[in-house]
Curated annotation (Swiss-Prot):
Pfam families: Kinesin. The gene is kin-13. Disruption phenotype: Simultaneous morpholino knockdown of both KIN-13 and PLK in interphase cells results in increased length of the caudal and anterior flagella, and to a lesser extent ventral flagella, and reduced volume of the median body. It comes from Giardia intestinalis (Giardia lamblia). One of its GO terms (cellular component) is ventral disc. This is Kinesin-like protein KIN-13.
Amino acid sequence: GSGKSFTMMHKDNGIYVLACFDILEYLRVYNGSQGNNSKFLVPVVSFFEIYGGKLFDLLNNRQRLQALEDGKGNVQITGLTEKQISSVDAMLNLIDSGLTLRAVGATGANADSSRSHAILQIALKYTKSGKEYSRISFIDLAGSERASDVQNSDRQTRMEGAEINKSLLALKECIRAMDKSNDSKSGAHIPFRGSKLTMVLRDSFIGNSQTVMIANISPNDKSCDNTLNTLRYADRVKELQHGKGGIIKFNVLKMGQNAADVILGTARDDENDVYKAGIVGVNAAPSQQARVPPASQAPITARQIQQNLPQPHYNPNYNPPNSKPAFEPRVETTDEDDMVRTHCDLVDSIYEQEDLIVRAHRRQVDSMMQLVKEEVALLHAIENDQVSIDDWLVKLSDILSRKEEAITTLKGNLSAFKQALQKEEELSHSIDLNKARKK
């Protein structure tokens, strides 16, 4: 990889460690200057990952989490474990335990590549009330190869790459929308709901917040295109300014400004306004970074970019139903960009179907356990002459019918899921053939 996780997590000079040193030192001075104990602040750490469009708590054995919006539009991570720390070593121990649970895997360029976005949050809370004073988030983005480069990999790696690329494209779309909002009098819709990543990062992009993006690039000639793409990406972020009416405040941290200045200094101006900061690591190669042109150029269309994902379109008024029919990919297309987009959409659909089937399987198991209890009671009754043969036959027939119905329903769901996986395999093969014809 290009060093994203190394930059964020190195135990001596990583961003996590340096920021924690600064924050704890400032807290020591800050709390020492407060005469009232009710104003004392303590640091609280949480650590979770986004994998396959799902959130997992890395401090609680990868328990599933939910990202929900409250009445004020703020994103809340329900069920997230928070641990109070008193030293850098305590934070490193928590991170080490969390990293053992993080999703990693081999790719074409890295034998131990991060396959999830890892988010470490350090929140400052009042000791007496528990109210949050400010928060800083560190996002170590997943490493992902270009879509056309991972097609020869196994299905799991392909699906991981497609989901990662989708979230990075959603992040790029949010940055573009914020740029347009700054230029527009009325403001533009910002599609934060385009992915779980952008939902979680929402607080770091709007309101009383600052964000720094770290662009990691690889020093070799094979990564030249990816390096340029990442630099364009970072340049677009750097050009963002204050939004209209103070709605968007997207500030670039100044050289020499440390994490404690961000999380303590600025927040002190308004103790009633929770201050949030975000630090995002962006890699260049070998990854699929969305190609963002410089601000002075017109947006580049998907067809103008070789081996790059196209621009997604988001409908802010769309409310997803509880379930939806199986996705039908356009396998017959010959345009590689269209095929990659179709593959990305299909993978997204497969992840959603997987969730539905897992829940259906859980319901089927619960139903079977209840039916087994009824069957055992019925068997005990007939053995002890507590029920007539006719009643026993009727009740046993009913139990067997309900078992059969539950199994048939689950098998139908599995059949549809297998078809979606087969279509993913066929589409991946089509992309391989299309790429081979171009060589």
